[in-house]
Amino acid sequence: MHELSYATSVLNAILDAVKQQEELGRKVIKVNDINLEIGDLTLISLDQLQFVFEVISEDTICKGAELKAEMVKPKIFCNDCEFEGNLDTKDELEVVCPKCESRNIKLKGGKEFNIVNATIEFDDEE
């Protein structure tokens, strides 16, 4: 279950961002949601990622934060026929050009795992 390591990385990154805001004198009340960009070839289960994040964030300011993700399809470039487009398979080992069925291809992307942004609630009364 590699979702645990990804969820832990997300939690640590958000907690670091919260700490930075608090060092600037801003009081963080809660983290509402976290938007991610996840490549299809990472084989991450969003349901498992959300479940694990919920468990490990239980005693933090991120408790109850919703993980949202945009799944990113890998791009393919065929060196033989020069086809370029989205790849529909999730198995990197079975990749062939959809136009000429060549295996002489290059993959671009699909392995991303990025935090795009997070919605953080601040105490504005200070």
Curated annotation (Swiss-Prot):
GO biological process: protein maturation; protein modification process
Keyword Metal-binding recorded: yes
A Pfam family assignment: HypA
Molecular function (Gene Ontology), one example: nickel cation binding
Residues annotated as binding Zn(2+): 78, 81, 97, 100
InterPro entries, per the entry: HypA/HybF (IPR000688)
Binding site for Ni(2+): 2
Keywords: Metal-binding, Nickel, Zinc
Coiled coil: none
Keyword Metal-binding attached: yes
Origin: domain of life: Archaea
Reported function: Involved in the maturation of [NiFe] hydrogenases. Required for nickel insertion into the metal center of the hydrogenase.
Family: Belongs to the HypA/HybF family.
Protein's name in the database: Hydrogenase maturation factor HypA
